[in-house]
């Protein structure tokens, strides 16, 4: 099954889910796909994978880059681009705060603290598409804070998101010279540091991720707060976000709170009618944009994080949503002009063995969702979790290190999955028999 097939497969799957309510049950038994099989312990102690899958480390913290700096830490969201001439570019976020090391001084950046450019931003990793050997590495954006996730655009750029709405006179803002909490755009074709221009019209908040509908040019944005909302940006000029536009928030008819924390406001397989409410004062100097949205009827989401675009739809991870607060995945279906969009609760975890605090999300070559876990416990056991179109979850990989996996993305040919080990930074390339999925399910208690 390929990515396009996910649409057809999910239609029948959602019907079955709505009938059975399989993932809305209060008990802890559930069905799980066998998937790619048992995870094989990694002798290097990094990443357990199913038999037949392998990984290689292509970039690590401290590696020398061509601009004289070294690879920074805290690698997070990431996108993969085809540069042509047999080259790929990975544009990689680094979720650095002012006290972190930048990997070396740089002269062009957005903001400073106490006169020194803050270390967050992006790096480029340019690869040979066949050998996956690194041809170049360099910093491509600087002077930002906590670049968490982002998203690719149809015109070949990476939207990198600051998960930090801080600035002068604000919490954590001592010594800063500018407000932060913006989205920045980095062309995949960049060859060095780009001029950092915040896309102010896309709002100031705890940005997490973004995705662009190629059919309309609309941008969908998540916010990592326990009382967040989902945003939509309508650009004045599709394909040119710098020209400004209109920011809106998602309102689900009759459901002001999608989190399912205090009751089942939306069952798995159920859907609601969506309207989009316009927002004002989107630069939000008091970091109150979500409050403005909620006051206008926008529906609350529990920590909106990963978002991935499909054909006419987007999948959104709510990290701590659900009755067990283990995570939800929503499916937003876009409708033609004059009709209302719809949002459907595709998945809600009832067990840590399904997934526990899903973060980044991507569609795999077989059409399944791949979710990166980011657990908030003293000892973590983070996995990559697959979710098949029938709603069954399975383990794809297990990280053996005490950190998270982030930024999962696939090469344009679908043969390689790239993923980051957050800290200490490692960027991995995973290959294997992506078409060998076993759809058989088992019941787990």
What feature does the model see in each segment?
Residues 409-445:
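Blade-level signature of beta-propeller repeat domains, shared across WD40, Kelch, NHL, RCC1
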Residues 1-14:
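N-terminal secretory signal peptides and thylakoid transit peptides that target proteins
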Residues 20-57:
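C-terminal segment of N-terminal export signals and the immediately downstream linker at the start
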Residues 119-128, 178-189, 234, 329-333, ...:
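Beta-propeller blade signature
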Residues 69-80, 144-155, 203-217, 296-311, ...:
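Beta-rich, blade/repeat-based domains predominating
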Residues 46-75, 81-133, 175:
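Beta-propeller domains
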Residues 43-61, 68-69, 128-141, 184-206, ...:
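Blade-edge beta-strand/turn elements of extracellular beta-propeller
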Residues 319, 352-389:
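Loop/turn-rich, solvent-exposed surfaces of beta-rich toroidal or solenoidal domains
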